[in-house]
Amino acid sequence: MISIRFQGKPFNITVIQVYAPTSNAEEAEVERLYEDLQDLLELTPQKDVLFMIGDWNAKVGSQETPGVTGKFGLGIQNKAGQRLIEFCQENALVIANTLFQQHKRRLYTWTSPDGQHEIRLITFFAAKDGEALYSQKKQDWELTVAQIMNSLLPNSDLN
């Protein structure tokens, strides 16, 4: 787990990178990860915009969880996915890459050599204070991301 904070205007951004234990890990190891992550979140200033990315070894499924996931999650929800959703609910976090449909080539970050298993990097996007940086509407979500990128990179070719 690693965290970095970018100070900027009109807001600061904290990025947290997490790699969760595999499904073979002891429950105590998984709980230790979530406890450490909770401690790190509590150290994050409330006004920061928070991006959390990582390999959670979790499938959140395609059933929408209001305020947390959209209908474009991967696979059938597993135990790790349920734990992840609970953590997000407790901390007002949104699993952003479940909110809108993506091109097939962007669904997976890893596929097993036999093609039977695929892993998707799960990303979050949320304001710690719960302000509305989240929208169920794809166009609103894209607009918010574009506004943030414009603020962060005012002199880039992206604008």
Model-derived regions: residue spans:
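A shared catalytic/ligand-binding motif for oxyanion handling
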Residues: 1-159
